[in-house]
Amino acid sequence: MDNRLLEILAYKPDLITDFPEWMLPPSAIHEMRKTENLAVAEIAGRDSIAAVLRACELRRLRAIVPTVAYTGTEYGNWAITFEKIYILKDRLQKDNITVFDPVVIGSPKFWWKLCGRYTTHFTKKYGFYSHCVGCHFYFHAVRIPLAKKLNCRLVIGGERESHNGKLKVNQIKTSLDAYQSFLKKFGMELFLPIRYVKSGLEIESILNMPWNEGDQQLECVLSKNYLEAEGSVSFHEEAIIKYFEEFAFQTAEETIRKYLSI
């Protein structure tokens, strides 16, 4: 793995619009801009890879820009995430779909403002709060400036409403609808091609390989924070709606528009 990438992932600078040329050279930007049916893709765990493959089956995509986003809460082997991009290259080259080199993006300060700073306030105000909702919102919002830079109107995400019958608060219908509506404000589509895939076995079928959920991906220090002690899912949907309507939408829009004006 490139030491320059490792340095970025160690320091996690504000990296949303001004990318180093070794990562995103002008020649690559030019090629991406002139490529029709280009998509910016989320690269994280198993579902994100399956989502890209399914998206290429459902849409006439000609090129993928894989993006790896950081917050400040991940831990584990980053190399695993980048290695999975080779799965895409291997699977998509036969269909003449280009997979560009990955772009790393992130802003822990933006994440903190959106997800961390007001934890106590939101818990008291709404009676429920989970960082996971804002975190996944951040993951989609933070890709908007890059997509705009590349004249790309499509972002692919790997969210699913059900995971073998289990719910994740950041992937319930209310959350996913909110993510998609936010990108629409910027003239973009957040495409969730596996949104209604419930079975993990179907995900493995799309991947054409065994890959258990949660394996071969980074961990998060806040994982499962919305679960009760015995493991049941606990959340207040009304609290999530208010979080978006009263805070997250406005905060994220102001932040993203500020980045776009730079």
List each model region and its residues.
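Nucleotide-activated chemistry modules centered on ATP-dependent adenylation/adenylyltransferase
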Residues: 2-262
